[in-house]
């Protein structure tokens, strides 16, 4: 414990938190409290988060459970926006200005991995069978733009940030037999066994149909979330991601592009990115020296790009948590900066 205490104190001092040129920056009590919190973080037991491993006795290409293998396209339609190859599409005339607005020197950031602050890192999903019992959801924020029908929420559903998470608390549920996707934002199990959520959306994955114009979903842009996640099974087992990814920016434009149906911005300035905007990694960007999983992600960004889906941190790429990720390898994509990306030509912008 003494060693840990010394390491933490060194880190705090190195960050200029103890004193600077003789001027006390923090009281002893504040420093002690921060050290205690850091020691707890370092010494606490690793959180438990298990995903469904491949079941050789289940012949279905889509298996059951949390983080289960999905060995088929979520949207099978070749013309679906998520499946579109955008590697040859023209660059938008305003690309450089938009990239600069988001952050030309800001890195790509994998918003997924093993654990972060004691909780699974990423947006979790679970696959259920068609006979999974459905339960009503009490929508208390965006009920007028939610699909008000029962949702097949399993017992102890995985929630973004964990059971006590304070963030977006997304929960994604895929019905493999009816091929429908149920997504919830700010899901909160109640003491009586019922559920509350801010919003919810149901997507028939057999169709290209989007949300009604002007409607949100469990995501700000009105898009489904699961089709845009970096998943372990695709990256490490199938070794190829064949769809666009989801990403966030700090501030967006008061506009959206299909397949998005909703905006979450206030500015109408042309250098602010609209929801549904698509960017790709430059074709001449050399990915050969990156770890295998990072190469899979970067090649996906060159061919399919990523779609702006929510406000958040700059260039945060969304994915599903999995204890099998090697965080050091996925974090290699941080070497990619905003200036290495380009906005593809935007058409049919709506407000």
Model segments located where?
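Hydrophobic membrane-insertion alpha-helices, especially the h-region
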Residues: 3-16
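Composition-driven recognition of long, low-complexity, acid-poor segments enriched in small hydrophobic
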Residues: 17, 24-46
